[in-house]
């Protein structure tokens, strides 16, 4: 609805509506049987001067306009001016708001000091008439209030709860902030003339850490340090109080205002407007109505203000000189940085603060707690010192007394905030909390000259200070009597008059809360020796955790420095490569080269590697290195993408908006060229942990993943190019599992110009990791010179860096347990605590599963090469292909040829193909995964191919690894002969895995089959299973070798002739010979057991005969013992015949069990003394008579024909030579 405005003279903030609208509202209220009450209205108009549309909110209390104006609303001239300069007859858009929340609390402040003084005088009137003049308020509004319909005061609404637009009620709480008039001080004429515009300018410097030299008895209170040159340039004095705050967007605007300000006071900064633009979010809200839009915007702004006020705390500290800082730096201690959330290498805003503008608060109580610093995620990576000592209450009091007498003499006063931390000595940090107890808060009074001012008089001092500027100190001391402090006490009085007088006690509590809230957020407290000496003010918590305040220091990469490089082993090449790439962007003195080369202001590197390979450790080390390097002083910020993987695209984009904006704001890149700053913004390193979790390779079967990836990549690109700065570049370091797992569209040279692949460490690198991590932990090996660490490293093939470190940690724990046990046993072992025996490290390795092998089923074997007879040429070829590259890696790394990684074992069944694979698992020290052919086949489409991929994936995770496929012809037959097409797809998948561009590094494929002609020929070409080894039916010498190996595990008679046996077993395979020997052994065991059984029967018969003979000669007697009765008389009752019979049976049973137990013991002793069964020639002859070759003559000829054709197709002969098989050549 559009209406014109008519300005009139009235003494309230309500508007009047046209009569027809009022009539319609009355009819509506009667129809709904509801009282109409007041109504909230939203008005919108166009400002022609500023060329923008404005909005405001007003209330209607039932008034109607002059009947002559049917399309107009009326409001007071003062109200129109406060809304934004609404002119008479201006067109307004009007909209009724139905659901406006009742106000819980409204914070207002007088627009001028005159308004504040008038308000103090007319407190009672405001309480009675406020609701009669205004009922709708919103954040940022300026409200005119009439005193007795004559005098006008104006209030600015700073905050409304619970919503940005509220309706006042009798239960609403109104909080008024004081606006005292600045009183002139005693040095108005002299000192204020000395405060020039140059002094009042805000300065922007880079933060560096300040270390306390406790050896010189130095302590830390609340100080910052710059060099003398900067102090003179800024026209500051030693001991001046400086306001420290973060850089924000508004610093540019406020800086311009300060340049145009001709007065002595500068404009206040507003650091509460950090907004992260997201253009796409606006497009999603087009369907919302104007009311919901405005409500949402105001809610977001209100929430952002609260959050930023909490995070961007303003700190006050005195400034001193320290020559260790240069002209671009300010030294700030950890205590201040923790309270103010200031990170090292970020740009901070420093501003001189005049004495009369300090928000000094009276001290009613001081609560002191000991601060215990907790480790953060970065400090856990470096070696920490011993834990902090916990002081008792009496010790803290004594330390405070000694410290205050030494450091707060000469009437020094230091500005502290609530929660400020003071370092008493190297082991004791204390937090000071002021006026945090309700019982200790100074009660409000109605007189401006009451006890607070008198109490502060005791804090005044006229003595000179050698370290602090005398004029500045006098300014602060004299100013502590000004009405500013008294006005703080009078807030409770104003609030009690604005509300009803029936709840006086509740109003006093509210005023106390108001005072405490003001002091907690804005107030500073001047700490002095006199105050700390007052036992009534000082309180120290006692008992348990109440006396301790745990704080976590900021995660500053400066804390790490280059110390992590001392821990990292086996990465020298990667570290050098990363430094060469990053230094061009990080070093400030190379900015000229960047300009000449037209280097972009943004780039990055990708660190790829499996879990536990050291990606995060390397990225963190590089961040710490460039954070402490004086040539870069880079600002480091980290984002863990693992926390974003479940979020929607819109939320992920907002997080990246905040990440880039925060990094640029903290480093000072948002400062305009006109801002007065002494430093160049530092370069920025953004560490993106696990970037592939949110930007993974899109799935072809999921179109949504591709769209999501493209949206995020496009947004990251736009952010990089938006915030790029050649003088202060942005470098991203992303960690991923592999370059293939990361979306390819983001791997462009403009964003990521370098990719570093972290492979599993070699044998020498594992030794280096072991030695460095031991040294890093402050340990060393006992008799290290005589140890063969290379041999121990060879047993950890496939271990990653984290696995080696885990073994060292386990060994340290075992060593500590051993030391405790020695101390408990009073053993005089004087070995150094830092010495670790190598046997403990070997014990720590036992039972440990490397991270790459967890969840993978590996095959273990105890078969050695000497357990295999014959097959000499096959064994030699397997050693050359698999064992040698593992034993001599450097020799093969220098070879320019690609190593052979696929071998096919073929031959008749029972010729030792599977046995050879088992020997490889036991001899070569490689992980061994065995797969039976039919295990991979599945009737469902895609399942078999997925099984093949999973097998090769497990092998790659467990590398170096041997992947053995038995019965290979069953899963990889010739293509085109399967109606279902399952094996065809499996063969295609095998071809993809075996012939990849990257190759199977560290994975050896071993396949065994008896029908090589059935295997698809494509799998047998070079680069795949290119080496075929023939396992032949053993000949005479090979059979003799096999029998000799079997003899070593059996008890053979010396009279047996193995040569004769080898002659008699022609065409026997290795499996046949083993079965023959096992059958002979079983016959020997049966004969031995029969002999023992006959011997036992003979001995048993002899014992029975002897027992019968003895029983005939004598009869066993037994005596029945009868106990006495209670009266010591013996019972005379005799046993019955039945009872005697049962008793006799029990005695016979006991005797029988006794005899049998003796016999069993005797038999066991005899068995143990017996010799094991001996295999004689007779046993061999019986077994040979019952056995025959497992491969018949027809099958042998069939195999020979098959293998001959196979060799002709292959064009070469491999494996053992055999008569009747023609030799093939490559001619």
From Swiss-Prot:
Annotated catalysed reactions: ATP + H2O = ADP + phosphate + H(+)
One GO biological process term: protein unfolding
GO CC term (a single one): cytosol
Domain of life: Eukaryota
Signal peptide: none
GO molecular function annotation: ATP binding; ATP hydrolysis activity
Pfam families registered for this protein in UniProt: AAA (PF00004), AAA_lid_3 (PF17862), PEX-1N (PF09262)
Binding-site list for ATP: 609-616, 907-914
Segments of skewed composition (Acidic residues): 264-289
Keywords: ATP-binding, Coiled coil, Cytoplasm, Hydrolase, Membrane, Nucleotide-binding, Peroxisome, Peroxisome biogenesis, Protein transport, Repeat, Transport
Coiled-coil annotated spans: 282-315, 454-519
Tagged with keyword Mitochondrion: no
InterPro entries named in the record: AAA+_ATPase, AAA_ATPase_domain, AAA_lid_3, ATPase_AAA_core, ATPase_AAA_CS, CDC48_domain_2-like_sf, P-loop_NTPase, PEX1-N_C-lobe
Segments of this protein annotated with the region Disordered: 251-311, 443-480, 1096-1132
The EC number(s) this enzyme carries: 3.6.4.-
Main location class: cytoplasm
Composition bias type Polar residues, residue spans: 1123-1132
Main EC class the enzyme belongs to: hydrolase
Compositional bias segments (type: Low complexity): 1108-1117
Keyword Magnesium: no
Biased composition (Basic and acidic residues): 290-299, 1096-1107
Subcellular location: Cytoplasm, Cytosol; Peroxisome membrane
UniProt family annotation: Belongs to the AAA ATPase family.
Subunit description: Interacts with PEX6; forming the PEX1-PEX6 AAA ATPase complex, which is composed of a heterohexamer formed by a trimer of PEX1-PEX6 dimers.
Role this protein plays: Component of the PEX1-PEX6 AAA ATPase complex, a protein dislocase complex that mediates the ATP-dependent extraction of the PEX5 receptor from peroxisomal membranes, an essential step for PEX5 recycling. Specifically recognizes PEX5 monoubiquitinated at 'Cys-11', and pulls it out of the peroxisome lumen through the PEX2-PEX10-PEX12 retrotranslocation channel. Extraction by the PEX1-PEX6 AAA ATPase complex is accompanied by unfolding of the TPR repeats and release of bound cargo from PEX5.
The name this protein goes by in its record: Peroxisomal ATPase PEX1
């Amino acid at each position: 609805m559009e209406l014109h405005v008519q300005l009139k003279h009235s003494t309230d903030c309500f508007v009047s509506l046209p009569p027809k609208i009022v009539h319609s509202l009355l009819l509506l209220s009667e129809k709904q049987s509801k009282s109409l009450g007041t109504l909230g209205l939203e008005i919108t108009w166009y400002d022609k001067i500023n060329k923008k549309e404005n909005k405001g909110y007003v209330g209607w209390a039932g008034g109607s306009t002059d009947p002559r104006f049917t399309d107009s609303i009326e409001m007071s001239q003062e109200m129109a001016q406060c809304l934004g300069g609404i002119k008479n007859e201006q067109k307004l858009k009007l909209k009724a708001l139905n659901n406006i929340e009742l106000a819980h609390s409204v914070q207002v402040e007088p627009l001028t000091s005159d308004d504040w003084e008038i308000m103090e005088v007319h407190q009672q009137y405001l309480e009675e008439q406020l609701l009669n003049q205004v009922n709708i308020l919103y954040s940022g509004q300026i409200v005119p209030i009439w005193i007795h319909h004559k005098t006008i005061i104006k209030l600015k609404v700073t905050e409304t709860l619970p919503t940005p637009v509220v309706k006042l009620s009798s239960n609403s709480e109104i909080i008024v902030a004081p606006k005292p008039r600045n009183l002139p001080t005693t040095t108005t004429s002299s000192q204020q003339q000395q405060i020039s515009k140059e002094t009042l300018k805000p300065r922007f410097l880079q933060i560096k850490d300040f270390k306390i030299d406790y050896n010189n008895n130095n302590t830390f209170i609340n100080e910052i340090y710059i060099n003398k040159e900067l102090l003179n340039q800024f026209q500051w004095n030693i001991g001046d109080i400086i306001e420290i705050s973060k850089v924000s967007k508004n610093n540019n605007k406020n800086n311009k205002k300060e340049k145009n300000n001709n007065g002595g006071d500068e404009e206040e900064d507003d650091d509460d407007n950090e907004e992260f633009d997201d253009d796409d979010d606006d497009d999603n809200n087009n369907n919302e109505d104007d009311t919901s839009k405005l409500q949402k915007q105001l809610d977001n702004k209100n929430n952002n203000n609260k959050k930023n006020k909490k995070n961007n705390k303003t700190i006050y500290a005195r400034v001193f000189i320290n020559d260790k800082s240069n002209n671009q730096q300010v030294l700030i201690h950890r205590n201040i940085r923790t309270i103010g959330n200031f990170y090292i290498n970020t740009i901070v805003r420093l501003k001189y603060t005049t004495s009369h503008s300090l928000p000094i608060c009276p001290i009613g109580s001081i609560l002191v707690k000991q601060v215990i610093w907790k480790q953060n995620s970065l400090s856990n990576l470096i070696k920490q010192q011993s834990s902090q000592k916990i002081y008792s209450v009496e010790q803290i009091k004594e330390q405070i007394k000694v410290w205050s007498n030494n450091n707060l003499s000469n009437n020094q006063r230091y500005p502290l905030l609530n929660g400020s931390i003071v370092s008493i000595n190297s082991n004791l940090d204390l937090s000071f909390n002021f006026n945090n107890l309700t019982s200790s808060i100074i009660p409000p009074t109605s007189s401006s000259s009451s006890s607070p001012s008198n109490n502060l008089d005791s804090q005044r001092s006229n003595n000179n200070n050698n370290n602090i500027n005398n004029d500045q100190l006098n300014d602060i001391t004299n100013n502590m009597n000004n009405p500013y402090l008294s006005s703080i006490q009078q807030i409770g009085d104003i609030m009690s008059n604005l509300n009803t007088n029936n709840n006086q006690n509740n109003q006093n509590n509210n005023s106390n809360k108001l005072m405490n809230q003001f002091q907690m957020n804005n107030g500073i407290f001047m700490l002095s020796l006199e105050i700390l000496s007052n036992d009534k003010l000082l309180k120290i918590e006692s008992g348990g955790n109440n006396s301790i305040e745990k704080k976590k220091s900021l995660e500053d990469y400066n804390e790490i420095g280059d110390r992590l490089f001392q821990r990292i082993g086996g990465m020298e090449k990667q570290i050098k490569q990363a430094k060469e790439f990053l230094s061009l962007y990080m070093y400030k003195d190379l900015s000229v080269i960047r300009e000449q080369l037209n280097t972009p202001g943004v780039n990055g590197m990708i660190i790829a590697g499996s879990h536990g390979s050291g990606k995060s450790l390397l990225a963190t080390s590089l961040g710490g290195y460039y954070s402490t390097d004086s040539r870069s002083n880079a600002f480091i910020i980290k984002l863990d993408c693992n926390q974003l993987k479940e979020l929607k695209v819109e939320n992920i984009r907002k997080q990246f908006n905040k990440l880039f904006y925060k990094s640029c704001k903290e480093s000072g890149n948002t400062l305009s060229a006109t801002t007065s700053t002494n430093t160049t913004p530092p370069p920025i390193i953004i560490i993106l942990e696990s970037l592939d979790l949110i930007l993974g390779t899109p799935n072809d079967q999921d179109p949504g993943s591709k769209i999501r990836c493209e949206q995020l990549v496009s947004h990251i690109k736009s952010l990089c190019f938006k915030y790029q700065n050649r003088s202060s570049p942005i470098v991203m370091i992303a960690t991923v599992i592999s370059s293939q797992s990361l979306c390819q569209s983001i791997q462009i040279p403009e964003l990521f110009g370098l990719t570093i692949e972290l492979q599993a460490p070699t044998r020498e690198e594992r030794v280096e990791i072991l030695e460095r991590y031991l040294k890093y932990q402050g340990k060393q090996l006992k008799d290290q010179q005589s140890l063969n660490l290379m041999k121990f490293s060879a047993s950890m093939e496939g271990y990653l860096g984290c696995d080696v470190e885990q073994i060292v940690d386990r060994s340290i724990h075992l060593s500590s347990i051993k030391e405790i046990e020695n101390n408990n046993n009073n053993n005089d072992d004087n070995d150094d605590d830092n010495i670790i025996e190598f046997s403990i490290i070997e014990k720590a390795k036992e039972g440990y599963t490397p991270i790459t092998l967890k969840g993978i089923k590996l095959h273990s074997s105890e078969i050695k090469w000497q357990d295999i007879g014959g097959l000499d040429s096959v064994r030699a070829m397997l050693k050359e292909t698999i064992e040698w590259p593992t034993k001599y890696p450097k020799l093969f790394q220098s070879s320019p040829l690609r190593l052979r990684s696929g071998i096919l074992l073929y031959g008749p069944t029972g010729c030792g193909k599977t046995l050879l694979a088992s020997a490889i698992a036991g001899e070569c020290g490689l992980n061994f995964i065995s797969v039976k052919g039919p295990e991979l086949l599945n009737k469902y489409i895609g399942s078999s191919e997925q099984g093949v991929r999973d097998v090769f994936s497990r092998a790659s995770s467990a590398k170096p690894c041997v992947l053995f496929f038995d019965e290979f012809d069953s899963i990889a037959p010739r293509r085109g002969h399967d109606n279902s097409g399952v094996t065809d797809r499996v063969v295609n998948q095998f071809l993809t895995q075996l012939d990849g561009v990257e190759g199977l590094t560290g994975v050896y494929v071993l396949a065994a089959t008896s029908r090589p002609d059935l295997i698809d020929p494509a799998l047998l070409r070079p680069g795949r299973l290119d080496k075929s080894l023939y396992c032949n039916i053993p000949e005479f010498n090979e059979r003799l070798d096999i029998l000799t190996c079997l003899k070593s595990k059996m008890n053979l008679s010396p009279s047996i002739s193995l040569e004769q046996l080898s002659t008699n077993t022609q065409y026997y395979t290795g499996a046949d010979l083993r079965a023959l020997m096992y059958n002979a052994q079983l016959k020997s065991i049966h004969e031995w057991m029969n002999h023992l059984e006959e011997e036992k029967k003979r001995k048993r018969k002899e014992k029975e005969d002897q027992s019968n003979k003895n029983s005939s000669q004598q009869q066993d007697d037994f005596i029945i013992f009868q106990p006495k009765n209670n009266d010591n008389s013996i019972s005379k009752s005799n046993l019955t015949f039945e009872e005697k019979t049962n008793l006799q049976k029990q005695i016979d049973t006991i005797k029988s069990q006794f005899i049998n137990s003796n016999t069993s013991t005797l038999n066991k002793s005899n068995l143990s003394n017996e010799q094991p069964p001996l295999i004689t020639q007779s046993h061999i002859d019986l077994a040979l008579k019952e056995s025959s070759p497992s491969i018949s003559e027809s099958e042998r000829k069939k195999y020979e024909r098959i293998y001959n054709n196979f060799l002709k197709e292959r064009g070469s002969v491999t494996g053992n030579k055999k008569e009747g098989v023609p030799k093939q050549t490559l001619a």
